[in-house]
Amino acid sequence: MVETQKYWFAARTLSKQEFAVKKRIENLNLEEGIDVECYLPTRTVISQLKYRRKRSVVPVARGLIFIHATKQSACDIHNVYGVQGFYMKDFSTHSMLVVPDKQMQDFMFVMDLNPEGVCFDNEPLTVGKKVTVVKGEFSGIEGEIATEANKTYVVIRITGVLVASIKVPKTYLKAIND
């Protein structure tokens, strides 16, 4: 039986190879016709050289790329087509880490809208109540409420991979009842 369900997988790349891996996967889609998409969260950084400024696009999380594919296609990318990378493991199931679609959609939405306003932290902030943003540009995003230095943040977790937080006024939040 061939599995047709597509999942988001978190993969690690070799040092400073994120863009090369993304380009290689995109080329495989065109040349080989495999149905795989990838997402590399990026941000623009302005660095000061001696007498000029240089604008460059860098990955938000070093060595991390997200791949949307079936389990078989995800394995084929590295085993058959030779793309360099390693899938992150889910320690509870001892299989490839699958990122839930809702978490991935929320993360991609926040990163596409305002990548400079997102703080990343592998150590979780103070965990609080589950909330949804009901107003503003982040409307519809679900996460957990956290406060740090009297500022309110909504923490978006991609379990086992990373934690992102966005600054949101408390009046824009609504508690989710479990």
Q: Can you name each region flagged by the protein language model?
A:
Residues 152:
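Glycine-centered loop/turn positions within well-structured domains
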Residues 140-148:
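Short beta-strand-centered aromatic/proline hotspots
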Residues 2-127, 145-146, 155-178:
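Acidic-enriched and Gly/Ser
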